[in-house]
Structures are given as C-alpha cells and as structure tokens.
Amino acid sequence: MASVNWADDRAARKKFPPPSFYMPLLVSSDKAPYRVIPRNLVPIGKGNKDEQIGYWNVQERWRMRRGQRVDLPPKVHFYYLGTGPHKDLKFRQRSDGVVWVAKEGAKTVNTSLGNRKRNQKPLEPKFSIALPPELSVVEFEDRSNNSSRASSRSSTRNNSRDSSRSTSRQQSRTRSDSNQSSSDLVAAVTLALKNLGFDNQSKSPSSSGTSTPKKPNKPLSQPRADKPSQLKKPRWKRVPTREENVIQCFGPRDFNHNMGDSDLVQNGVDAKGFPQLAELIPNQAALFFDSEVSTDEVGDNVQITYTYKMLVAKDNKNLPKFIEQISAFTKPSSIKEMQSQSSHVAQNTVLNASIPESKPLADDDSAIIEIVNEVLH
C-alpha cells in the first residue's frame, strides 16, 4: 500500500520562473502582445552588440470577482537568448507566450548573461526606440518594506488622531471663554449708556451682508474645439503626424507593415523627405480605377483588397529613397550598400531581417512596384 509522507512538500511547491534583469512591461491593449511589441525592442545596458537578442515572456493575469474569472492586462518579462524559463528554445522557435526580439547585428547563439539573483532589485528597462503607447514599465515594489511602512502609517495616524482631539478640545474651551467675555462686555456698556440717558429705542435693521454687492457669476468660457484625433477616424483615413505618429495610427513596423525608417515612423507625413516619397504613392483615383479590387466577408466585416502595380523608370530621382524605406525597420542600410553587397557566408549566423533575398532590378528601363492594400469595412 502506498504511503503519504506529509513532510515532503516538494511536490506542492510552486515553481517560479527565474527572475528577469528588468522590470516588466504592462500590455494595456486588446491586441495580443506579439502584435504590440516591436521586433527590435531589446533593453539597453547589458551585453555586447552580439548579445542584443532574446524574448519577452508573456505572463497572463486574472482575478476572481463574484465567482467569475476576470482577465487582467498581461505583463511581459525580458530574457536574453539562452536564459530564463525558455532557455532551451532556439531563436524564433515557436512557443506559446514567447515574443522573439533582436537588434541589427546580434548573433543567434545563446548569450552568457545569465539571470538576476532574487535578492537583487530589477533594473528599469531603457530602449533605443520609443515605447508604443500600449506598453508601459511596471514600477518595482519592494515587499520587504511593506510591513514597516504599514506600521509607520498606523503610528502616524494614531498620533495625528490624538493630537487632533486635544487641539479640538482646547479650541472649544477657548471659544467658550471668549464668547462669555464678549457677552459680559456688551452688557456692561449697554447698562452704562442707559444710565446716561442713551436708550436705543429704534434699532436699525442689520445691514450685514448687504453692503457688498455680489459679483455676477461669469459664464464659463467655452472650450476651444480641438482637432479631431486620427485614432477616431477609420484606419484607412488616418494620416500620421508628429503628434500622432505611425505607431499610434497603424501599429509598430513588422513584415506585413514594412514601410518607413525611424524618422518616418516618428513624424509621419511631417517627416522631411515624405513629399519626395509621396511622388511614388498612387492617389485615390489611381488606386480605385487602376487596381484589381476584390472583396471577401470576414465575420461581420467585408474585406476590400486593392492590388495595384506601377512601372517606374530606374532613373527616377525618388526611386532610391523609396526603396530604402522597404523593411527599413529591420535593415537600415542605404541603396548603394544593398547594390554593392557581395554574397558570402559568415562563420557565425548574424541576425539580419528574415526578409526575402533582394534581387537586382530587371534589365529593362522600368522597375515594377506592386502595392496590395486591404481595408476592413
């Protein structure tokens, strides 16, 4: 017969993941974390340039309210490649709750950075790019000081309460003595005047409160009508600017939304070189009349797909800058560098955007630019 050893509680212990070097981020969005976290969101401050690679581990959170489970915004914790709860995973190996990130030039081999010790405080993460509005740093709370703070607050409240009672009693006695003295003085003066023949027969009505006219209430100034937010517009009508940038309007750059370098993403149409790039963007009429348009039902919506191709001469002065913006978030290199890049095999695998291999333009006089635009209505 099997026996139970109550002294052995190892099976009942909850296994916690190794602590991260950094404070976690809170994902305050209805979107999945992998749709919000930029693919190059690696904290700065640890490791060399080869080790700027790792993953964000998603921590699902919930609480019970009236017997029902209520989901809370998830937190994400950063770990370098080869560390943390998923240290055995290879870079970009699929796993639930894992969002892979890396910087340009990082190597896809395990780092030697290890994990934070539990008695060390986590660092506040800092990044070389701006955090999307859906992400925020969760401040560290030292639980070891909670009891001392609670005791201090309790003592302060008790002292304040006793002091308040004592002060209140003293003020009450002072007011009572003052009122009694005033009454005695008024009675004595009145009696003296009466004995001298000054009997106040007619009392003038009190004018208290009537000598000072009340100022009419000024009407509140009407609030100035603010410019409508781009986020209130349909997605296909938004125009990103410095105030509401590309990430706010359309989300972070990824392989399905791959146009724009850091300047364009930050400033939108207010970026310095955007007017030149706009020369190679079809207008509404061209997109409508010169596209292959198709529709498809997606749940309660209709998906409208525009497939558009345009021929641009190779000597077009705006073409090099335009091509530079393609997947610029993964490989911010110039056109000349792309054209002069020689094919070679590196000894170590170096991360450099997993985009299709770039091919030279055709030998004819024009380049083909294909645009596929999908709109959910």
Curated annotation (Swiss-Prot):
ADP-ribosylated. The ADP-ribosylation is retained in the virion during infection. The gene is N. Keywords: ADP-ribosylation, Host Golgi apparatus, Phosphoprotein, Ribonucleoprotein, RNA-binding, Transcription, Transcription regulation, Viral nucleoprotein, Virion. It comes from Human coronavirus NL63. Belongs to the alphacoronavirus nucleocapsid protein family. Residues 19-151 are annotated as: RNA-binding. Residues 140-183, 196-244 are annotated as: Disordered. Residues 17-139 form the CoV N NTD domain. Residues 223-337 form the CoV N CTD domain. InterPro entries: N_prot_C_CoV, N_prot_N_CoV, NCAP_aCoV, Nucleocap_CoV, Nucleocapsid_C, Nucleocapsid_N. One of its GO terms (cellular component) is host cell Golgi apparatus. This is Nucleoprotein. It is found in: Virion; Host endoplasmic reticulum-Golgi intermediate compartment; Host Golgi apparatus. Homooligomer. Both monomeric and oligomeric forms interact with RNA. Interacts with protein M. Interacts with NSP3; this interaction serves to tether the genome to the newly translated replicase-transcriptase complex at a very early stage of infection.
